Amino acid sequence: MMKIRIAIVLFLYCAATSVVYAHGKADADAAGNNNYTGTIYLYGEQHGVKKITDKELALWRAYYTKGLRHLFLELPSYTAEYLNMWLREKDNTILEEVFNDWKGTAFHNQHTYHFFMQIKELCPQTVFHGTDVGHQYGTTGERFLRYLESKQQQNIPAYLRAQEIIQQGIAYYNGGNAKAMAYRENMMVQNFIYELKQIQNDNIMGIYGSAHTDTAALDSTGAVPCMANQLKSIYGNNLNTEDLSPLAKDIEPIRIDTITAAHTDYRAYYYGKQDLTGFKDFAYREFWQLDGAYQALKNSGKTGDWLPESNYPMKVEAYQVYVIDYTKIDNTKMRLYYISEGKMQNRQLITENIATE
């Protein structure tokens, strides 16, 4: 059965993608005669960070108390529908199955699992809405269709909609290039519009990766306006956004070391390591901030190598010096020094590599 479905969807793939690729952005006509009078509260996140999911849960509980019930998520429609079924069940079998399907993604972590469990306990009348393309179409998507088939519900809107979203997922995963990324961004807009139309003028809250929630930004490829940018052009002041992702960098140093730079010893605040698996020749990199080193090193020669704040696990501050040790797969190390002079690029601080000797 699944092979037949996939074959049909693949047959439609070229037509489905060429229209969106040709336009370069989601079809604004999909919004129809927009007369939405509710309020959209959109929050950007870094997936799977406890401090952020805790904040999102607190926000949703506050909105829930005020009467909001509709929570939009960066998930396919069928995943959201499946989770809505789970909210009505006594056990957690459905959540366990969906969570298992998320293995290998940023959603497969205990913080996200706890988030959903808390919603079931504290906000049981929540209605999830998924507006992403068909991720996990061969697992969650197929299981959702089989469930509805077992209930003889092949003609209900949720079943037909799931088939459409599976088609989007196959189109996206068969794209394999920047066009596929732009396609996904545009589909997220159209899917958002679709879901919003289902609830008339109710206020809603949404949680998405921060790459999708900047009302002035392009998508990750720079090809099309990102989701929130496009939604802003449709819903105007009805759309409110806030980026929660900086909370992920609001961390304390793990320990204090001593690092010598330009013949001077400095207190070095260590913030941990980042895995570089997948980068040729490198295993991981580690980060320090040198306390009080800026004045001594501000006139050091610059190499022209820039590193934005998004590369750091902690907040980057202006007028500071940072040390990054790169460890290669052969266990050799390379130490680089970066200085922050308050320069901004794409709304974030950037650091520049300096020569300390």
Task: List the predicted regions and their residue ranges.
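Positively charged n-region of N-terminal signal peptides that target proteins for export
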Residues: 1-6
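Bacterial N-terminal signal peptides
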Residues: 7-18
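Compositional signal for N-terminal targeting/processing segments
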Residues: 21-357
